[in-house]
Amino acid sequence: MKRIFLFIVTNLAVMVVLSATLRVLGVDRYITAQGINFQSLLILSVVIGFTGAIISLLISKPMAKWSTGARVIDPAAPGGSREAWLVETVHQLADRAGIGHPEVAIYDGSPNAFATGAFKNDSLVAVSTGLLDSMTEEEVAAVLGHEVAHIANGDMITLTLIQGVVNTFVVFLARVVGYFIDRTVFRNERGVGAGYFITVLVCEIIFGLLASIIVAWFSRQREYRADAGSAQLMGSREPMMRALARLGGLEPGELPKSFEASGIAGKGGLGAIFASHPPIQARIAALQHMRVV
């Protein structure tokens, strides 16, 4: 949950800064000077929407390290046999998945793990000390396979594209609603007034919350795919099923809110529609019915 929250917060922060800057520069007033110029508004919405998502993606790896306090393991000088095993296991899984070797990191915390990075060949896999201490090596390897599968599937890129599209609609619709509220409720006939800017701000918050349901749905689907990817990389579904079962009996480690959707375990937030992860039981059931080639 931690990683996705940070991604979304960074994304929204960039959107807000861009929106505010463009308002100060009078772009909103220009677009609505002669009624709404939908073509110009759409271009503005795309610029604001995708800029936030892309910047969030590009800084996702350093932000993840900073927010979790993760320590990257030097492959040439690991701090003991456990760290050496971690690096070797991640590299082997990456080779099977056909991607470059990710950086491998450890952070202190309850059982969890995550993967992040803008590019498949320049990514990061991090695992908590709590997870390492509570699982067998085979179960840890399955969790690492799950994270490597996220990278191989290009989940962060897809999330960025989805977030960009969602942002575009949020920005576009908020300004359309703001324009008509300013005209019909506040009776402003010249340019745009305070009613427009207040309505846009409120609508961006409301529409952004509703849009997060779409992002959460995608996150749940990618968890099923990553579970299946782990089973394929491990050559068996059993290790991942055992790892999930163990997680189901443990308190999921909380990642910083911005990165929650990247973790192996999450609490789901405000109800099922906002949950970044499916229920553990549903994930195990999906693995039971999959075919491992």
Swiss-Prot record:
Regions crossing the membrane: 4-24, 40-60, 161-181, 197-217
GO biological process: proteolysis
CDD domains: M48B_HtpX_like (cd07335)
Positions bound to Zn(2+): H146, H150, E223
Co-factor requirement: Zn(2+)
GO molecular function annotation: metalloendopeptidase activity; zinc ion binding
Active site (catalytic residues): E147
Keywords, comma-separated and alphabetical: Cell inner membrane, Cell membrane, Hydrolase, Membrane, Metal-binding, Metalloprotease, Protease, Transmembrane, Transmembrane helix, Zinc
One CC-aspect GO term: plasma membrane
Mode of membrane association: Multi-pass membrane protein
Note describing how the cofactor binds: Binds 1 zinc ion per subunit.
Family: Belongs to the peptidase M48B family.
Record's protein name: Protease HtpX homolog
Source species: Bordetella petrii (strain ATCC BAA-461 / DSM 12804 / CCUG 43448)
